Structure formats: C-alpha cells, structure tokens
C-alpha cells in the first residue's frame, strides 16, 4: 500500500536534514557561539567588513556593543 513508502521517506528526510544542522552547529562552535554570516550582496559584505574593523581583534564574529566602542 501507499503507507509502505513512509519509512523510506522518513529516513531520506532525516539524511537530508542532518548535514544542514551539523554545519550550523560546527559554525556556531567554531565562531564563538554565533552562526556563520554569509554575504551574498555587496552591502552585506560591507557590514561584515565594518564589524571586523570595529571588533578590534580583526574578526567579524566578535561583536562589540555601542557602549564598548571607543
């Protein structure tokens, strides 16, 4: 019957889901608790470069709040 396909679909769905979640967890672990930022457009790249300059440690994922900027 049609429901015999459901376990195979579930296994396939889990196998497609795991790499995306693992990638997000690895990026969060390696970037100090933040997810990796992606710059698809020049404006996003500009914001990442600004964050890198403002951080003081030359890393875009180390953020400083407005109260900590000299």
Curated annotation (Swiss-Prot):
GO CC entries: mitochondrial inner membrane; mitochondrion; respiratory chain complex I
Subcellular location: Mitochondrion inner membrane
Keywords: Electron transport, Membrane, Mitochondrion, Mitochondrion inner membrane, Respiratory chain, Transmembrane, Transmembrane helix, Transport
Principal place of residence: mitochondrion
Superkingdom of origin: Eukaryota
Family: Belongs to the complex I NDUFA1 subunit family.
Protein name: NADH dehydrogenase [ubiquinone] 1 alpha subcomplex subunit 1
Source species of the chain: Bos taurus
């Amino acid at each position: 019957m049609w429901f015999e396909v459901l376990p195979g679909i579930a296994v396939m769905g889990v196998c497609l889901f795991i790499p995306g979640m693992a990638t997000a967890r690895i990026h969060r672990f390696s970037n100090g608790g933040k997810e990796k930022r992606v710059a698809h457009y020049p404006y996003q790249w500009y914001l990442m470069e600004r964050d890198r300059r403002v951080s003081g440690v030359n890393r875009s994922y180390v953020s400083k709040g407005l109260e900590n900027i000299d």
